[in-house]
Amino acid sequence: MGNAESQNVDHEFYGEKHASLGRKHTSRSLRLSHKTRRTRHASSGKAIHRNSEVSTRSSSTPSIPQSLAENGLEPFSQEGALDDFGDPIWVDRVDMGLRPVSYTDSSVTPSVDGSIVLTAASVQSMPDSEESRLYGDDATYLAEGGRRQCPYTSNGPTFMETASFKKKRSKSADIWREDSLEFSLSDLSQEHLTSNEEILGSAEEKDCEEARGMETEASPRQLSTCQRANSLGDLYAQKNSGVKANGGPRNRFSSYCRNLVSDIPDLAKHKMPPAAAEETPPYSNYNTLPCRKSHCLSEGATNPQISLSKSMQGRRAKTTQDVNTGEGSEFADSGIEGATTDTDLLSRRSNATNSSYSPPTGRAFVGSDSGSSSTGDRARQGVYENFRRELEMSTTNSESLEEAGSAHSDEQSSGTLSSPGQSDILLTAAQGTVRKAGALAVKNFLVHKKNKKVESATRRKWKHYWVSLKGCTLFFYETDGRSGIDHNSVPKHAVWVENSIVQAVPEHPKKDFVFCLSNSLGDAFLFQTTSQTELENWITAIHSACAAAVARHHHKEDTLRLLKSEIKKLEQKIDMDEKMKKMGEMQLSSVTDSKKKKTILDQIFVWEQNLEQFQMDLFRFRCYLASLQGGELPNPKRLLAFASRPTKVAMGRLGIFSVSSFHALVAARTGEIGVRRRTQAMSRSASKRRSRFSSLWGLDTTSKKKQGRPTINQVFGEGTDAVKRSLEGIFDDTVPDGKREKEVVLPSVHQHNPDCDIWVHEYFTPSWFCLPNNQPALTVVRPGDTARDTLELICKTHQLDHSAHYLRLKFLMENRVQFYIPQPEEDIYELLYKEIEICPKVTQNIHIEKSDAAADNYGFLLSSVDEDGIRRLYVNSVKETGLASKKGLKAGDEILEINNRAAGTLNSSMLKDFLSQPSLGLLVRTYPEPEGGVELLENPPHRVDGPVDLGESPLAFLTSNPGHSLSSEQGSSAETAPEEGEGPDLESSDETDHSSKSTEQVAAFCRSLHEMSPSDSSPSPQDATSPQLATTRQLSDADKLRKVICELLETERTYVKDLNCLMERYLKPLQKETFLTQDELDVLFGNLTEMVEFQVEFLKTLEDGVRLVPDLEKLEKVDQFKKVLFSLGGSFLYYADRFKLYSAFCASHTKVPKVLVKAKTDTAFKAFLDAQNPRQQHSSTLESYLIKPIQRVLKYPLLLRELFALTDAESEEHYHLDVAIKTMNKVASHINEMQKIHEEFGAVFDQLIAEQTGEKKEVADLSMGDLLLHTSVIWLNPPASLGKWKKEPELAAFVFKTAVVLVYKDGSKQKKKLVGSHRLSIYEEWDPFRFRHMIPTEALQVRALPSADAEANAVCEIVHVKSESEGRPERVFHLCCSSPESRKDFLKSVHSILRDKHRRQLLKTESLPSAQQYVPFGGKRLCALKGARPAMSRAVSAPSKSLGRRRRRLARNRFTIDSDAISASSPEKEPQQPAGGGDTDRWVEEQFDLAQYEEQDDIKETDILSDDDEFCESLKGASVDRDLQEQLQAASISQRARGRRTLDSHASRMTQLKKQAALSGINGGLESASEEVIWVRREDFAPSRKLNTEI
């Protein structure tokens, strides 16, 4: 019994020299591992069905009996029968290559790449493969067992038509790929890819000498029965050309070959069969290129002796597929990094099939990972490269050895790697051309799990790797952080990035420069770079690589043009589906029948999913286009707005509402995800593998999914017609035309149909397995399939209990049959087995007793696993010295009973009790002991020689999920053992340090590795002028700065729009309804109206600041953004205090859920909420709107930090932005502090407001936005009515703008219950706040203490004045602050609110003016900063001194930046600015001189920050009053000098500055409305007297 060969040949072309044609297959996985691999040997076993395998690809494929008859043999005749079913040498008598070949119909899978797969040389035609080396001494298997014959020389001679060979394994069979990740045979012609032996050593070259003598044989000779044919030429050398396959001509193929020769002059010398009537176009389209029918190797072979050739041994093979082109050459991607010449296409041949040599040391590859492109008239010839190569193998005698070193195209560097093992193919792929390399921290983010679900990764650790982007694959290398990597480095992990989307994550709470990559497998990863520049470079590099792959799939050279056309097509599809969806919704409203409604709803759901897919692809293509053009990435909000409700629910479950999570969810449900499980070596039951198609073939079944498959009776009993009927139409009828068209246009929308994808070229070769009743059948083992996966799949199909069976592999080693029992988690795809056996387990009783010795323990570890709702106990490991090992307990045994109790009924505590007992009775289900004569292997052969780690999954970072396990050694302890693979987690054994080299240096170093190596190809001159040079352009700092500024403005506009929507959609309608009380409305919306007014004003400020530079889009240097950056930073500085409005809103937000829960019980409220959100979009819910202000105010520091990072560290705008960042961080800290205070004391404040008496409340509200100070003071004179105090109580003092609140909170525990003789026992209602008192501002006084040392003692006196109308006596509070500084701050805040009270009384107003129309550097908008300016003529005389003093005081208080300078001892004195002024004051003082420009007229806003010297001089020469000049001299601040400033006289100078501002208000009162006041940089007007200050 052998694994069926995956390659077959077709006998279409017969000349004097015959082509050796091969077939390529694909695999769908991307996994690297520590495991090494080798090709699997041909199977052995039971013979009766070994000649009866048939391909399921063609509706005209003949059966095995017919093939035998055509070859002159009787079906199942004595000659071909095997007398010993279990004979390990059964292949000696088999002449048929029973190798099902993938049939490719372009109409079935056009979305894959839209091209045909040409059948290349069979595996037997690949000489000198590692299998011959592995089984070289097997005389029984192969003729001349100890001898190896090579049919070629080192100089590259062609194949011998007749030669004796051992069975070989080609290198190409070890390469497998995903839809869009191709490895072509020509790619494998590199010296590293010739064959598996080439990497391992050059010992094979000596065998070539033996073959040189055979080359001179001119006439074909028959192959003996013990010899092996190595190509189609070998098989048919005995016959003349013109033999007609299947007894007749094949018109399609004949026409195809004729046209092929007409297109390729090199092939014109071949004689073609007569052309058929039908004609094909001179240049066949890839979607219409005819494909040969697949059938057994023996078809058309009329010589019975050839049929008995040893070359027909059936075995398992994996081959590569070149779907696009031989080299992928005529389809250049974006033109990055050069390509090869035109002539290189014609010269490349796959020396993997006709030459063998050892690669020179240090030889690497030169070429572009973006595709070795060829343009001009010959570009199209690459389509037929594979076929032409195979034809010329048997005719060309001048192949050069060096031609194997052809340029490495993107098909190689981006190809899906072949297996979990780190084979030579893997190593070669990892040595492809480097697009980008650098040190990155990596963490798992999202992982696609079972049932198409996306979940957060469980093992989420940041790990450091050296990451290299080669093609469309990210390789992760472990490095010491000092030396980087070289061409010998082996990647530890790999991540496939084709069709990925990369998004920056500036909102990451802990790390900067983070980006997220989500791929088409439904996984997402977080990466952290070292700088913003690196982050942008990685995004551009990955998107460019993906764009290259898109162009390659569509066979286009102009990537930009392709992307634009695809975007246009997608927009049309989106428009059409949206219209259809709307029509369906309209129809739904008019339909009453429930069945019809359900049908319409299902169709609407399909449209929604299609729209999501289209929108995702549209966004992805726009990202690629932006990266290629060096532009700005599209706004993700537009994409997220199209998420359907189920998707939003899923993202809500994840807690991540982003492009990455959206992309992962969409990808998880598309057809591409069928590959995903092949990327992980993890255990999972077959029932959970929804993306894996049923892989058992040739089985009797009536299930719907297998209707298209021939049954075993049809294959072996009913002959060819039955098979034809079974296969007819399965490729034509299962995929509708519309689906095909959609797939051609957009490959990523394609979803595979299990009914039609029966061994399409994307899947793998079946392997024989034997059931317990000796019934043989076939199954497909894919890369990543573990022993448990395969066992569960087979058992489920045959209605067997997988827990009662185990999987055993049969090997043939040195003429002896040996067996190997793999671990459940072991990847059996890597093993070179002959066949799989399903064997029943046995049950046995084990009784274990502990002795009195304390050292005795059971010595085994149990793992609890829930499988399909059934709890099972498995032995995870057994200690060799333990009692369990002595009794025969083995790892992997299933525990059925413990002490006569069923294991499934035991919980962890019961297990602990059992394990702690002195004796233990176990009923276990285990593997039987080996039978007599059965040999068990310890280290089975793998595909590549090397150490095999059976216990570790090859992608450790992709497999882990903590389960429950119990250690029997410690009866009371529980340990954790892996239960089932969970998801990607990039783990490494140790953390790597930061590399000493910069990432750019090392990326260049990686590229130099390939530039240093010789190559036969030279760069194409066309690439030197490639139109795609923009793809390599990275965003400059100016571009990034402009991008951040635009993001700030755009997001601010969106935010203001959302706030207005919240008011119009929810607040105003709710005020008219009765669902909620006024208090509940206050909790929900708080001071939302004030916030909206402020944000509208702030947005105008930002927009006007950006308008200072009219040609912002044209700026190319960072220093040209100086005006804009000063304006933006100044806006945040000026409005910093106004942002404290958010304190009240954020503080009350904690109560929002309690109010909204009312919707669950109040149907009217719920109906209102539903009516306001008719589409039920998560982004339009009330909860979503209410969280936006909190998110926005915390976003500002992040945006400022991005601006800050892009400016020159020595520039003044850099310093300016730094101050703005610190200010906004203080605002955020203030908001957080207010929220904590509200949570603790909010109830007290509400109670104090409610307890007020009188018709009009003195204090309307105690809002967190009005809280100026919170401190703790000692109450020196508590009243006796409050009881005795062991020590003076400590009060919490709150200074609001409208009142001072004093609260005493008792920290003691709740009192015990009170028991009285005259009443029942009750609990006293415990109130922790024993004292609370509110002093309104109208009744507040501060008195100076008579004690001279009061200031030193930090004591102050607060008075609540008496009220005769309310009958309230005067109350005095003697308070002691913690320090004199604390007392000073406290009194400062109190005096501040008292001054506000007096000002309100003076102006007869009830509140402070709210709007302050100000934008830094904004002309009239500065009026608010300098004081009110009525529209009056300046010609009017100056007001009186008393009015000036009053206006001065008013202007100073309107200065939003805190300008209150208070003398603690005398509140009546003019306040003085404290020396420790805030950052805002210092910035204003240092950057601006207000007074110099008070008298300037007719100055435009565009003159602000002008570099015009004449303008500056004109300002300098302006006349100023003497008094104003003196004030100016006192207030003028010299240019900031770093490190040499001092704080001397800071307070006095700031006082003068504010006086200056006040005077300007006086003079400005008479100014006309048309005049403007301008702020300019202080450095432009440096006065003669300079004062240095230090921040």
From Swiss-Prot:
Location (main, coarse): other
Biased composition (Low complexity): 53-67, 367-376, 1014-1028
Phenotype upon changing R622A: Reduces PARD3 binding
Modified residue annotations for Phosphoserine: S231, S356, S358, S695, S1519
Stretches assigned to the DH domain: 1040-1234
UniProt feature, compositional bias: Polar residues: 340-359, 412-422, 958-975
Cellular location(s): Cell junction; Cell membrane
Bilayer topology term: Peripheral membrane protein
Listed GO biological process terms: activation of GTPase activity; brain-derived neurotrophic factor receptor signaling pathway; cell migration; cell-matrix adhesion; ephrin receptor signaling pathway; positive regulation of axonogenesis; positive regulation of neuron projection development; Rac protein signal transduction
The keyword Signal belongs to this UniProt entry's keyword annotation: no
Keywords (A to Z) from UniProt: Cell junction, Cell membrane, Guanine-nucleotide releasing factor, Isopeptide bond, Lipid-binding, Lipoprotein, Membrane, Myristate, Phosphoprotein, Repeat, Ubl conjugation
Domain of life: Eukaryota
Positions where Phosphotyrosine occurs in the chain: Y829, Y1323
Tissue: Highly expressed in brain and testis and at low or moderate levels in almost all other normal tissues. Found in virtually all analyzed tumor cell lines including B- and T-lymphomas, neuroblastomas, melanomas and carcinomas.
Modification after translation: Ubiquitinated. Undergoes 'Lys-48' ubiquitination at Lys-1404 and Lys-1420 by a CUL3(KBTBD6/7) E3 ubiquitin ligase complex composed of CUL3, RBX1, KBTBD6 and KBTBD7. 'Lys-48' ubiquitination at Lys-1404 and Lys-1420 triggers proteasomal degradation. Ubiquitination at Lys-1404 and Lys-1420 by CUL3(KBTBD6/7) also requires the membrane-associated protein GABARAP and may therefore be spatially restricted within the cell.
Gene Ontology annotations for the cellular component aspect, listed alphabetically: cell-cell contact zone; cell-cell junction; cytosol; kinocilium; pericentriolar material; plasma membrane
Cross-link (Glycyl lysine isopeptide (Lys-Gly) (interchain with G-Cter in ubiquitin)): K1404, K1420
Functional description taken from the UniProt entry: Guanyl-nucleotide exchange factor that activates RHO-like proteins and connects extracellular signals to cytoskeletal activities. Activates RAC1, CDC42, and to a lesser extent RHOA and their downstream signaling to regulate processes like cell adhesion and cell migration.
Domain notes: The first PH domain mediates interaction with membranes enriched in phosphoinositides.
Name of the featured protein: Rho guanine nucleotide exchange factor TIAM1
Native species: Mus musculus (Mouse)
